[in-house]
Amino acid sequence: HVAAMASDIHADIRWTVRALRDDPTQIRLFPVVHGIVERFERNSNLPVNVRLPAVEPTLAFDTLRHLGYIVEEALVNVWKHADCRTAWVAIETQNEQLHVVIGDDGVGFDPAEVAEWPVGSKGWGLENIRERAQQVGGQCHIESAPGEGTRVVIQIPLRDQPDDARRNQAMWEEVWRLFGF
């Protein structure tokens, strides 16, 4: 468990540094998703279809960071386990909710079977995805069956997202916390 926590902390630092390469006040959902997908496609040679809403929602830095990791972790799971031809990331806003689906047309699995694994034995990726969704007030559920692919479904409330000024302040507080400025 300690190794997984250390890995998460290291990943948080890497993500924050990557995000700060550009103007940190301009960090937005669409470029983050496209960047993750482009890196994934380059490293995996697996095509990923991306569907985004017409209007880009403004998200708190913490929500954006966790959502970036969720998409990244779900795609890594696709690459490791799905044995698929294609994957997708679909994002839409509806009824003050951000809906994110990361899916594939792969081999699938029985989610009930995964839920029965002892803590720490396997499934850290799915557990991390669930925890990150909960940390930003969201929910996660997995839709899968053997032979039918997998869908990781995330719902995050939009009503609690701060405006840009508070979002930027929260981002800098996170940087100061991570790097001790």
Model-flagged regions — what are they?
Residues 1-181:
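Coiled-coil dimerization/phosphotransfer module
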